[in-house]
């Protein structure tokens, strides 16, 4: 497997992972009409615009071999929360892995890569938002040391509550041991400008 920074060319592949992950992780939590609106075409457009900005990286994990299939991705940025200092607090807006590959350590590896990026840029903390009812995701983050910090909001345009998690960005990010770690890979996504 290989990590790399996504390019604009990767938008369709990232969109496919994103939609597949949403369909499995959020079904029964997110309203059906929101999930139905989350199409590959819509996500491709969204990711094309995001990747074109070149402000912050989206890290992708590629399958070994010549195919270069994207297995998962993690987006990292400065915090977008009004109560956070975007100079010292980073954010993970999206972490997604193909559903059939969860529990094999890929999500953790992507998350570690994103935290390493924040550490490299001198950030002290990182936050992310998790749907309150997404117990597998919450367990995944808590197992890795993330803790709820009291931040709560509704997912853009819905009545679905989200909980904010926070972790310090250590000088040496936790890394997955050699091979893959058994655990729960999860999904998190927050796009307040979503229709």
Residue map of PLM features:
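Acetyl-CoA-dependent GNAT
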Residues: 5-9, 19-100, 108-113, 117, ...
């Amino acid at each position: 497997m290989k990590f790399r920074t996504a390019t604009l060319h990767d938008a369709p592949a990232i969109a496919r992972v994103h939609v597949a992950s949403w369909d499995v992780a959020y079904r029964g939590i997110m309203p059906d009409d929101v999930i139905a609106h989350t199409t590959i075409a819509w996500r491709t457009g969204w990711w094309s615009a995001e990747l074109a900005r070149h402000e912050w990286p989206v890290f992708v994990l590629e399958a070994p071999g010549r195919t270069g299939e994207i297995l998962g991705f993690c987006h990292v940025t400065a915090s977008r929360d009004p109560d956070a200092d975007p100079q010292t607090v980073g954010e993970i807006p999206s972490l997604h892995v193909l559903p059939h590959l969860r529990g094999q350590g890929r999500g953790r590896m992507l998350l570690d890569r994103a935290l390493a990026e924040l550490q490299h840029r001198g950030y002290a903390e990182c936050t992310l938002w998790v749907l309150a009812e997404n117990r597998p995701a919450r367990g995944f983050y808590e197992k890795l040391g993330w803790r709820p910090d009291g931040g709560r909001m509704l997912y853009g345009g819905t009545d679905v509550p989200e909980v904010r998690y926070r972790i310090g960005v250590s000088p040496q990010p936790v890394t997955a041991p050699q091979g893959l770690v058994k655990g729960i890979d999860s999904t998190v996504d927050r796009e307040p400008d979503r229709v």
